Regions:
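Catalytic pocket-lining loop regions of alpha/beta-barrel enzymes
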Residues: 123-125, 135-245
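Short aromatic-enriched loop/helix-cap "lid" or pocket-rim segments at secondary-structure transitions
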Residues: 13-19, 79, 111-112, 170-172, ...
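Conserved, mostly hydrophobic/aromatic
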Residues: 6, 57, 85, 118, ...
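Mid-to-C-terminal alpha-helical segments outside catalytic/metal-binding sites
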Residues: 1-8, 12-59, 64, 234, ...
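A general structural detector for well-ordered alpha-helical segments in enzyme core domains, enriched
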Residues: 52-56, 81-88, 114-118, 142-146, ...
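Active-site environment of divalent metal-dependent phosphoester hydrolases
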Residues: 10-13, 72-75, 105-107, 133-134, ...
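Short, flexible/disordered intra-domain loops and linkers
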Residues: 42, 75-76, 166-174, 256-262
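Active-site gating/metal-coordination segments in enzymes
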Residues: 63-165, 295
């Protein structure tokens, strides 16, 4: 069973006019990242409906997807996406699971109240969060409360990570790798998923391995835009296949030179060619999130 552990989806009002919505909603960083047009004239991503997502999954042989919230600058936009995700999961419980967006800058009570509402609505994790993009410190007191409660509730936390050696692009924010090792050590009961191969943290820090950071997993979101296909045989043995979660970053177009729109199947083929086995392609995230398999 293939599970895409890193998918974004947006309410219809965003998809109808992404740039206009971002301007009105106060989300300039999201606009820079998600509404940009590439030099060749292609949008960096599309804005599919939930039905279009399900059709794309069917075409690629993806059984389930984990919807990740965005690291919004405004809590009200987190709330709107969380309610939308709750509705998506209710409508398609056999195909979709979802994580909650949060903005700790909004303060103790608003954030914890939203976290409770999200859990009550069926959301099973937190993220994608980005302290460096959202404007709070990794040692922020509200963020610490969020991570502690996430551990109590067994809700994994997905964090956006940028490779310090990666290329520049509009909207890029630096995310010092040392911060993520520090978080994992400070909150050992919290399960962390570091997005985008975790900026290759285990490859640059000998102390960041599965033995020293047993609560850390890594997803592969946007991999073809960041690394060549050699990243799979290079990173899998060093990180450990049991710690890697296949994630695409759909609806980002990962192969703009070959495809006019997102192509999940091409990325799955790349992963398999690079050595991704059934655990990477779905088994690991199914166990982490306690998702039922086809055999259950």
């Amino acid at each position: 069973m293939i599970i895409d552990a890193h998918v974004h989806l947006y309410p219809p009002e965003i998809g109808r006019d992404p740039r206009g919505w971002a301007a009105a909603a106060g989300e300039p960083q999201w606009a820079a990242l998600c509404t940009r047009i590439r030099r060749a004239g292609q949008p960096v991503q599309t804005f599919p409906t939930v039905e279009e997502l399900l059709r794309a999954m069917d075409a690629a042989g993806v059984a389930r997807a984990v919807l990740l919230g965005w690291y919004w600058e405004k809590l009200e936009n987190c709330v709107a996406q969380n309610r939308f995700y709750a509705a998506c999961v209710r409508a398609h419980p056999d195909r979709l699971a979802a994580f909650a967006a949060l903005q700790p800058c909004a303060g103790h009570w608003p954030v914890l109240e939203e976290m409770h509402r999200a859990r009550d609505g069926g959301l099973i994790g937190l993220g994608e969060l980005s302290p460096h993009s959202q404007g709070y410190r990794v040692d922020d007191a509200v963020f610490a409360e969020v991570l502690t409660l996430a551990a109590d509730w067994k809700m994994p936390v997905n964090l956006h990570v940028t490779d310090p050696a990666g290329r520049a692009y509009p909207g890029r924010v630096e995310t010092p790798l040392a911060d993520f090792g520090s978080l994992a050590r400070t909150f050992p009961q919290t399960q962390f998923i570091l997005a985008h191969w975790g900026g290759l943290l285990p490859l640059v820090d000998a102390n960041a391995n599965s033995a020293t950071l047993p609560n850390v997993f890594y997803d592969t979101a946007a991999s073809p835009l960041i690394y060549d296909s050699g990243i799979w045989p290079r990173a899998l043995p060093l990180i450990g296949a049991d710690r890697v979660l296949f994630g695409s970053d759909f609806p980002l177009n990962l192969y703009p030179k070959q495809d006019a729109s997102p192509n999940m199947a091409r990325f799955i083929a790349e992963a398999r060619s690079g050595g991704a086995d059934a655990s990477v392609l779905g088994g690991n995230v199914a166990r982490l999130l306690r998702l039922k398999s086809d055999a259950d």
